[in-house]
C-alpha cells in the first residue's frame, strides 16, 4: 500500500473527525467509516477482484476513496449515492485531489429511487447510510447483488445494533444468504448468496 496514500487519507480522516467533534447535531456530522473498516473494504475488493461497486451513502467520500484505491487494482467502476449535493461535491473534489475520480460516478440521488430503477448488477455493495431505510432497501438489494460472488457490506451494525436489528433479522431470515458480523470499527455485516 502506498505510504503517500496512507498519509493523505489519514490527514483527511483527521479533518473529518475534527469536523464531527465540532458538531453535536448528528445530521451535520460527516460520520465516516472507521479507518480499520475502510482498510478491510480495500482488501475485500482486491481479493474479490470486484469490477462493479455500489456505495450507498457517500458522505464526504472517505470510504469512496478507499473503494477507488482498490478499484485501481481491479479496474472497477464505482457508483456512489449521496442525497446531499454539497457532500457529494466535496467527495468528488476529494477524489480529484487523490487522482481517483476516474473510477467513480458520483450521483446525487435518493438511494431507494436509484435501487428501484437500476438494472445493473454489482459484485460489491457498501451500505452506510440512514439506517432507518435499510429494511426498505432490502426490497431491492438482492436483485442487484450478483448471485455468484457478490458481497454486501453494511457498516455500524455493532455500534447501532438497536437501529439495524430489524434489518439484520430480515436478511438472516432469508435462506438464500449467508451472513456474518465482524467486530471491526463500528461493526460490519457481510452478506453473500449461498
Please identify what each model-predicted range represents.
Residues 1-124, 131-153, 157-194:
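A short alpha-helical cap/connector motif
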Amino acid at each position: 500500500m502506498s505510504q503517500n496514500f496512507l498519509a493523505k487519507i489519514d490527514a483527511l480522516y483527521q479533518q473529518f473527525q475534527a469536523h464531527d467533534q465540532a458538531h453535536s447535531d448528528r445530521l451535520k456530522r460527516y460520520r465516516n467509516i472507521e479507518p480499520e473498516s475502510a482498510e478491510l473494504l480495500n482488501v475485500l475488493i482486491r481479493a474479490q477482484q470486484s469490477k462493479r461497486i455500489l456505495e450507498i451513502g457517500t458522505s464526504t467520500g472517505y470510504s469512496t476513496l478507499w473503494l477507488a484505491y482498490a478499484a485501481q487494482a481491479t479496474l472497477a467502476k464505482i457508483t456512489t449515492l449521496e442525497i446531499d449535493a454539497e457532500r457529494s461535491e466535496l467527495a468528488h473534489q476529494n477524489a480529484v485531489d487523490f487522482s481517483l475520480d476516474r473510477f467513480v460516478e458520483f450521483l446525487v440521488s435518493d438511494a431507494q429511487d436509484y435501487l428501484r430503477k437500476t438494472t445493473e448488477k454489482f459484485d460489491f455493495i457498501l451500505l452506510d447510510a440512514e439506517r432507518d431505510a435499510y429494511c426498505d432497501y432490502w426490497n431491492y438489494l438482492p436483485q442487484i447483488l450478483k448471485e455468484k460472488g457478490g458481497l454486501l457490506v453494511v457498516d455500524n451494525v455493532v455500534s447501532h445494533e438497536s437501529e439495524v436489528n430489524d434489518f439484520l433479522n430480515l436478511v438472516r431470515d432469508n435462506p438464500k444468504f449467508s451472513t456474518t458480523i465482524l467486530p471491526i470499527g463500528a461493526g460490519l455485516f457481510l452478506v453473500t448468496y449461498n
